[in-house]
């Protein structure tokens, strides 16, 4: 596995692969890799000739008071995992390389899709995401880029950006990977105390309960949301950020559950904010 910290060298490598007719997959990550990330890597390995994984904890997608400084990092362990998965190139640039002192260019998707859910509680977050992802696409020149369904809103925003700015690549969605007890895998799970970890299982339980309600004929969004709230509020350490039930294609509001429905939530346990979601076909 080749390791690149320099942007120009990464671009030269990517150009060389293209010249040789090789297809390139990109898996963008912030590191501290777990099985969820490795599922993206495995899918990329199956579909493309060359696999690039980027590791960059992106400061501009963290707001004031968020966990940028504390975000877990272990490049040595990450590199070993990626070697095992036969990744061709690891791109891990420094902050000053990605954002020199004079940096003033941002890529932002406007509208309802970025204003609700995580966009409402983390202003500027998605602007940071779309800016860094645009840069990674230009640097690594992938034919396909792999994103996890756990960050459903982010995934849809990136898809919209790619479509509207005509990036010559395909976004591949990869299903959520869960622990045996149902908790969605996340690098932030390491922050949880044993008590918080036990309570965090309520996220998936609430989602499955909502799915069951819909399958049993409930169509009223307010009723489903209220039942989810009651279940989560029964956990003393849980503080709900949002529970959203929206159109799974574009995050638009639904009057009642119909078509493809995304049920998504964000809940804090202590200082740790966790997200999860599932899609129900009605």
Curated annotation (Swiss-Prot):
Residue positions binding beta-alanine: 61
Pathway: Cofactor biosynthesis; (R)-pantothenate biosynthesis; (R)-pantothenate from (R)-pantoate and beta-alanine: step 1/1
Keyword Transmembrane carried by entry: no
Annotated Gene Ontology cellular component terms: cytosol
This protein's UniProt keywords: ATP-binding, Cytoplasm, Ligase, Nucleotide-binding, Pantothenate biosynthesis
Gene3D superfamilies: HUPs, Pantoate-beta-alanine ligase, C-terminal domain
BP terms from Gene Ontology: pantothenate biosynthetic process
Signal peptide: none
Gene Ontology MF, one: ATP binding
Catalytic activity, reaction form: (R)-pantoate + beta-alanine + ATP = (R)-pantothenate + AMP + diphosphate + H(+)
Catalytic residues identified in the record: 37 (proton donor)
Binding of ATP, residues: 30-37, 148-151, 177, 185-188
InterPro entries: Cyt_trans-like, Pantoate_ligase, Pantoate_ligase_C, Rossmann-like_a/b/a_fold
Positions bound to (R)-pantoate: 61, 154
EC number of the protein: 6.3.2.1
Additional free-text comment from the UniProt record: The reaction proceeds by a bi uni uni bi ping pong mechanism.
HAMAP family per the UniProt record, alphabetical: PanC
Name this polypeptide is given: Pantothenate synthetase
Lineage of source species: Bacteria, Bacillati, Bacillota, Clostridia, Eubacteriales
Gene, per the UniProt record: panC
